C-alpha cells in the first residue's frame, strides 16, 4: 500500500474516492485489512499530506473512519464532532480540506 502524493491525489475523482472507501469498508466487514507500514507512512507524510477524502463523523470512540474504511495515514481528513452537525468551525475545516488540501469527496 502506498501513501498518496500530490500526483496520485490529483488523479483521484469523487467516483474513484468513493470506490476506494467502499472497497475499504468491505475489507473491514470481512476483517481483511491491507498491510501497511505505519512508521514508513509517518515518514512519507512528514513533509506534506494529500488526503483524497474528508469524512465528518461522530466523536464515538468505537468508530474511526480510518478503521472502518481501511485507510492509511494521510488518506483521509477526519472531522469528528458529537452529533455529526456542521457549525462554522467544522465548515471551515471542510472548506480547507477541499479547497486547499485537495480532497475530492466529502462523506458524512
Identify the residue ranges that each predicted region occupies:
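Short, intrinsically disordered/low-complexity patches at protein termini
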Residues: 53-54, 101-103
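Thiamine diphosphate
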Residues: 88-101
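Well-ordered alpha/beta subsegment
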Residues: 104-108
Amino acid at each position: 500500500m502506498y501513501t498518496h502524493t500530490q500526483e496520485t491525489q490529483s488523479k483521484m475523482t469523487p467516483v474513484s474516492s468513493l470506490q476506494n472507501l467502499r472497497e475499504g469498508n468491505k475489507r473491514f466487514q470481512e476483517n481483511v485489512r491491507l498491510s501497511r507500514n505505519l512508521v514508513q507512512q509517518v515518514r512519507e507524510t512528514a513533509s506534506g499530506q494529500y488526503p483524497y477524502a474528508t469524512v465528518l463523523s461522530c466523536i464515538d470512540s468505537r468508530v474511526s473512519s480510518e478503521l472502518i474504511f481501511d485507510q492509511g495515514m494521510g488518506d483521509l481528513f477526519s472531522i469528528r464532532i458529537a452529533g455529526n452537525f456542521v457549525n462554522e468551525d467544522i465548515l471551515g475545516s471542510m472548506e480547507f480540506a477541499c479547497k486547499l488540501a485537495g480532497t475530492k469527496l466529502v462523506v458524512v
